[in-house]
A protein has these predicted regions:
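Glycine/tyrosine- and acidic-biased, solvent-exposed loop/turn segments at the edges of beta-strands
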Residues: 1-170
Length: 170
């Protein structure tokens, strides 16, 4: 069971609903429309935490479920995203609506694709990466270590090239 509640004669959801999280824990909440995200969708309020269904991160990335807190109308604290198959796709941290902190994306097979720290978004909407970032290929093999300072590559970049069974650090 995922959710349970009542509908009006017009088919509109009414009153408090019960929801079950991924661990089977029952939560109470109320379905509401919420416009914190870039695309409009239906959001379910659960004890101060929101479960989100539908695309929420632009047109090219569709998350079908997200879980995290919204405070003061903005994303805040840790958020976890799952893809349309229910597989983990990202873990992100927000500070009053701004991405800030650990930022990890995952391949549908479960291994990491990118992992590092962000300190906000620049004027063009790009993440401001800081410190060491690691990038893996679709097979889960580490392919690059890049160091950033305020969103710009800085210092050592290590690329790992794998060809015909041998690897080389460039």
């Amino acid at each position: 069971k995922i959710e349970e509640g009542y509908y009006t004669k017009n088919g509109m959801e009414k009153g408090n609903w019960s929801f079950w999280d991924r661990d089977g824990k029952k939560r109470l909440g109320k379905k509401i429309d919420y416009k914190t995200f870039k695309n409009i969708g239906l959001y379910k309020h659960l004890d101060g935490v929101f479960l989100v269904t539908g695309p929420i991160d632009g047109l090219s990335t569709a998350y079908t479920q997200a879980h995290g807190a919204v405070r003061g109308g903005r994303l805040d604290g840790p958020w976890t995203y799952w893809d349309s198959d229910g597989l983990l796709s990202a873990k992100k941290y927000y500070d009053k609506g701004t991405p800030r902190g650990q930022y990890t994306t995952y391949h549908p097979y479960g291994h990491k694709l990118a992992d590092g720290v962000v300190n906000g978004i620049d004027d063009y909407g790009n993440l401001i990466k800081d410190g060491k970032w690691l990038f893996w290929d679709e097979n889960g093999i580490l392919k690059e270590e890049v160091h950033f300072n305020s969103g710009k590559r800085e210092g050592l970049t290590i690329s790992i090239v794998i060809a015909k069974g041998c690897s080389e650090i460039v």
